C-alpha cells in the first residue's frame, strides 16, 4: 500500500500543478540531465547496402525499400556507404569534436522482431568522435545564463532498426516494416550538463538547426528522423532513462513529471531504497512507467564486427571537409544583429535559424535576397538605417510568400532585389503610399503563383501603378484633405469615442480615423498627412 502511495500521490499532484503552470525546480534538489539523440542521415543509400534510403518517404509501401542484407538473408555482407562517414565528419567538426582517425564497428546483440540480424551494428569500443561541445548563448537562445556549454561525450555511426506495427483487435498481430532497417544513424551522447528545462529545449532547437544547416537530416522529431532519449537524476541518485518521447513537448513534460516523481520519493526518505539502481522508464503521455531496471537490463554482448573494416580517415580529408562547412548560426546572428543591419533577434532568426522546415524559402537564398536589397538601399540612401527594407522583406514579403504558398526561388528572377528596392524607392518618393505598395506586392506575388508573371516577364512597377490607379493622391490640397477628415468625423455616431480620443483616454481611436481615410481613398492618401489633419481638426493636444 505504501508503494502505491509513492506512485499515485506525486502523479495526482504533478498533473494538478502542471495544469496550473506551477512547475518549478526546487533549488535544494538539483536536476542533472543528459540527452541521447539519434539522427537519421538523409544519405542516398543505406549504411551497409545499395538500397535507396527512403526513410523520409512516408507514402512508400512497407518492405519495398529493402535489400537482401537489410532483411538479413544468410550469406549477404555489408558494404559501407562512405557518404554516411562524410556526414558524420561534418557533424563532428561542427560540434568541435575530436575525430578518431581510426574507428571501428561493433555488434550490439539483442533479439527483437524489427532487428532481423539479431544484432545492431554500432560503434561501442572506438566511436567516430569524442569530446565535442555545443554552446548556448543567452543573447540568442531562451536560457537564463549568458553562456552555457553542453559537452558532447561521443558521436557514433550505427544502423537503424525496422519498425514494429501493432494491429488492434483480438489477434494482437505485430507487423514488421523493414524499410527503415539499415538506414544510417548518428547517435550523439551528451554529458549530464543540463540543469533546467530551458537549456534542454534550447539545445534541441540549436541541434535541429545545425543538422538542417549541414543538410544531413531534416531534424523532424514527429517523423522519427530525430529521436531523443533523456537521462535524468535528482541530487545524484541513480540515473533514470526516459524513452518514447515523440516530440519536444513530450520531452519537456516527461522531464517535469519524472523530476516531481523523484522529488516526492526523496522528500519521503525513500531515495536510498527506490532510487538506488538505474532504470528505464517510458512516457505514456501523462506519466512515466517502468520498462526495465538494472536487474532486467539487457546484456548486449558487444563484440567487434568481423565483416566491416575499420574506418580510416586522413588528416587532410578532415581539413578539406572543415573548409566546406557553412557559417555557424551564432556567427550569422552576430552579423545581422550588428551594423549595418541592427536587426532585433526575432528578425535575425528568420534569416539564420531553420527552426522549422520552411518549404517557401531556403534560408541561404533569403539572406542573399535581403542583403542585395539592402545594398541597393544603402547606395541610394547612405544616411538611412535599414529598418524600412528589413520590415518590407521580413514582414510583408515573407508574409506574402507563406500566405500565397509561393516559393522564393520561383519569384527571385521575376521580382529581383533591384525591382524590390525600386518599389521601396517609389514609396519613399511619394509616388505610391505604403498601403498601395502592400497591395502591389501582393499582386505581384499572386501573379507569380498563378503563372501570369513568368521568368521571362519584365516587371514595370510604374506601368502597374498606372494600370491599377495606385498613385498617391499628391495633388489634393489642404482644404480638400480637411473636408475628407471632417466628413469622416461627422459620420462618427459615438460622441464618447471622440471625447476619449481628444482627452487622450483612448489614443488608438486616432488610428481608426486614419484607417477610415485610407479606406475612402483606397490607400492613396498619405497616412501621416491624414493623422496631422485629424489632430488639427479635433484640436488634439497630446
Swiss-Prot record:
Query: Which branch of life, at top level?
Result: Eukaryota
Among SMART domains, the record links this protein to: GatB_Yqey
Query: Keyword Phosphoprotein on this protein?
Result: no
Main localisation, per the record?
mitochondrion
Q: What is its EC number?
A: 6.3.5.-
According to its record, what are the GO cellular component terms? glutamyl-tRNA(Gln) amidotransferase complex; mitochondrion
Q: Where in the cell is it found?
A: Mitochondrion
A single BP term in Gene Ontology: glutaminyl-tRNAGln biosynthesis via transamidation
**What does it catalyze?**
L-glutamyl-tRNA(Gln) + L-glutamine + ATP + H2O = L-glutaminyl-tRNA(Gln) + L-glutamate + ADP + phosphate + H(+)
Q: Can you name one GO molecular function term for this protein?
A: ATP binding
Residues that span the membrane, as ranges: none
- The question of whether tRNA-binding is a record keyword is answered with no
Ordered alphabetically, the record's keywords are:
ATP-binding, Ligase, Mitochondrion, Nucleotide-binding, Protein biosynthesis
- Cite the Pfam families for this sequence: GatB_N, GatB_Yqey
Say what the protein does: Allows the formation of correctly charged Gln-tRNA(Gln) through the transamidation of misacylated Glu-tRNA(Gln) in the mitochondria. The reaction takes place in the presence of glutamine and ATP through an activated gamma-phospho-Glu-tRNA(Gln).
NCBIfam families with a match to the protein in the record? gatB, PRK05477.1-2
The note filed under miscellaneous reads: This protein may be expected to contain an N-terminal transit peptide but none has been predicted.
Q: Which family does it belong to?
A: Belongs to the GatB/GatE family. GatB subfamily.
Task: Describe its partners and assembly state.
Answer: Subunit of the heterotrimeric GatFAB amidotransferase (AdT) complex, composed of A, B and F subunits.
For this entry, the protein name equals Glutamyl-tRNA(Gln) amidotransferase subunit B, mitochondrial
Naturally occurring in which organism (per UniProt)? Candida glabrata (strain ATCC 2001 / BCRC 20586 / JCM 3761 / NBRC 0622 / NRRL Y-65 / CBS 138)
